[in-house]
């Protein structure tokens, strides 16, 4: 949970009341925050202004600054209405070049026109950017933001990807001009290691660097590292251009919405933002940014009441939701449905359960019925289907006297490929961009490395060693927005003086029998219904030649059979790579086919 420090008296002034420490602690608890510390006593000794340190939910990005905290608490206390965020007419453009697809493909922008900041609001503006960078932006790897004095630069603005040597500018708080490659060297120096140097790894290996320039080709920023000294903002800046670059479009839009909604209150026309026309013709992403259109989500009144043990009317639930910045009206077609209007400041609302939770907060957790009055509320959790399948694998394996192990999901690149006699073509495993140690370089694509490392650490135990694991592996997929996906696997190994292939095949048979999947002889030709069989397969070099097989599965009558796993006798070279001086057989199956 992020911790936000706010000026105590400033917050109480915004709330219109001076709370005691206990009163404010109770208010935070009721709202869903936690007061971590009140520095009043320390401040009296040092002569500084007292601060409150608040623990915020990780998905409530609108609460990462004093502006958002005070606005949300005032709405919760019914002292203020939800702001109506508006857009004025655009006056400039951000043109995105196709070359940016090589490194950070998404960009967006907005203008805070005629803004008036003081020392405290300016500090809050900078602090919010730091909090967003550290949390939602994943230390600038997903999203980076820059702010510029619009009066010092001229639009339209261009977002390009250029070779490092072609980029020249004076970076923020410096007096010397650098090229892109020289700037990387500068920020990798020991003096900058804990500052901007923390983000150098994001772009340093790329042949091109992202850069935002104005109409006169003056560099505004080199995301995700540094802004230009030329466009530096100050407390006296009246017009601020906000630029966002990202590898994730959704998160980029969230960051822009949070920054603009939180600080547009200081504009001459409060809560009004000047949009920027985003021109991105190469990928069809041209649009006006930001987008302040509210989302509408439908939720069942019965669902909310059943979860909370209440019998609230539509108006009563709407009143609770209003305290949490959500406006709701009852559907005219279906009286059980509420149309909930979700503002751009609440990207954390993703499902009806989020609305139900806010209704509970608005109603008051301490006011919820207790004891016998909860007869219509069900608190027994329902397992996800894949977890239910995983538990079946665990029970069946344990009944067969195998012991479950829980290795780490990360492993070294060699353990995932070279040690298993496999090659890496670059499109299979997710690699960590900046691994702390050589032992944690990639996310595993098979359960075998972790199991073999477990066997290695327990090789002094009596033989045979029979262990299994049910866990996730991860594969890259460029077709998906997140570029990767999880897949639940089950795997088991038999380690002894003999390979024990017949034993591992027997375990596979028990697992399949547990899932009502019968063995089909003659490579699946003996029957046309649901079942499984194995076929010899020498393509997996992890196994001894002629001792590897693929597991084939037909889910139902007439269905096309498909490979769901593999088994075999592990190659002696694989065993020696993991310092295990015994023979072994291994089986691994995709558990998701049984959903």
From Swiss-Prot:
For region 3'-CCA residue in tRNA, the annotated ranges are 86-90
Gene Ontology MF term list: ATP binding; magnesium ion binding; phenylalanine-tRNA ligase activity; sequence-specific mRNA binding
Record: residues binding Mg(2+): 348, 354, 357-358
Please verify whether the record's keywords include Oxidoreductase: no
Gene Ontology CC terms, in alphabetical order: cytoplasm; phenylalanine-tRNA ligase complex
Report any Pfam family annotated for this entry: tRNA_synthFbeta
Q: Which InterPro entries match?
A: aa-tRNA-synth_II/BPL/LPL, B3/B4_tRNA-bd, DNA-bd_dom_put_sf, Phe-tRNA-ligase_IIc_bsu, Phe-tRNA-synth_IIc_bsu_arc_euk, Phe-tRNA_synthase-like_B3/B4, PheRS_beta_core, PhetRS_B1
Provide the primary localization.
Answer: cytoplasm
Whom does it interact with, and what assembly results?
Tetramer of two alpha and two beta subunits.
The protein in question is named Phenylalanine--tRNA ligase beta subunit
Q: What is the organism of origin for this protein? A: Saccharomyces cerevisiae (strain ATCC 204508 / S288c) (Baker's yeast)
User: Upper taxonomic classification of the species?
Assistant: Eukaryota, Fungi, Dikarya, Ascomycota, Saccharomycotina
